[in-house]
């Protein structure tokens, strides 16, 4: 039988928030006896927006904004029931998007 694995993908706009959440997940998984791979940083997605400031003329007057989406991947190898229960009870920050896939 192949080993079971939980893959957790984290997304957030603030890198400090995502790193703190990843360390909480790693700490919780290690405390229950599971082996953890990661957190692996994925490329940061940068979206830039250019907006004209002037309502009529002046194409030279523009503001530029950007959003950075930081991503991390964690693999929990061979988790047990205690690991799954502890991860379900874990409360992370509100600005972190968590996707969990069981393979």
From Swiss-Prot:
GO cellular component: ribonucleoprotein complex; ribosome
Ranges that cross the membrane: none
GO biological process: translation
UniProt KW Ribosomal protein keyword: yes
Keywords: Ribonucleoprotein, Ribosomal protein
Record carries keyword Methyltransferase: no
One Pfam short name: Ribosomal_S10
PROSITE patterns: RIBOSOMAL_S10 (PS00361)
Entries under InterPro entries matching the protein: Ribosomal_uS10, Ribosomal_uS10_CS, Ribosomal_uS10_dom, Ribosomal_uS10_dom_sf
Superkingdom, taxonomy of origin: Bacteria
One Gene Ontology term of the molecular function aspect: tRNA binding
Subunit structure: Part of the 30S ribosomal subunit.
Protein family per UniProt: Belongs to the universal ribosomal protein uS10 family.
Reported function: Involved in the binding of tRNA to the ribosomes.
Protein name (record): Small ribosomal subunit protein uS10
Origin species: Xanthomonas axonopodis pv. citri (strain 306)
Organismal lineage: Bacteria, Pseudomonadati, Pseudomonadota, Gammaproteobacteria, Lysobacterales
